[in-house]
Amino acid sequence: MLRRSVLLVLPALAACAGLPPIETASLPPGFVQGAGDPTRAAALHAGSVFGRQAQLAGQPGTAARAIAEMEYLAVELPSSPVARNPVPTLQPQMQVARREWRNALGVAADAPPQRVINGLIAASRALEEGRQDALRAALPPEVFTAGAEGTLARLGALPPLPRTAAAAASAERSLIQPERSPVASTL
């Protein structure tokens, strides 16, 4: 009887062994001012920033924050319960956009999203505070392959990121309550 039970459990265990770990991500405490929802705040800010990307030139701190938000959204938004109007193509859009912004910054392809988020947010804060030592520590070369100086230069002169802009717009749309028609509400 015990042998039979073990034989029944083995295929289930084998099936679980091949699954990759589930990615998770979070934004640091205090990232969103007030009592706002961090997912909504990230989508609205990133959508606004990438909707007018030309204004990012020479603004590496703003670029770092917006890309950190996109990295967070790529992990959290596709399965988020706050998405009121889910865009069906959001997950593949985010995957393609993530490759685009990671390539533009020189982020290691296998870098865990939380390390990317933490590094970019710490870099943004270090830039705001004028702390060069903290800036170098925020962008470790095993995650940011161009090193701190190279990554900072890339953040200050981002190339056009059309896939990122499209994914940011889709993320923003997915959180906006769709308009209800007066006719539909009376039916």
Model regions: which residues?
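N-terminal mature-domain "stem" immediately C-terminal to a signal peptide or N-terminal signal-anchor/transmembrane
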Residues: 27-52
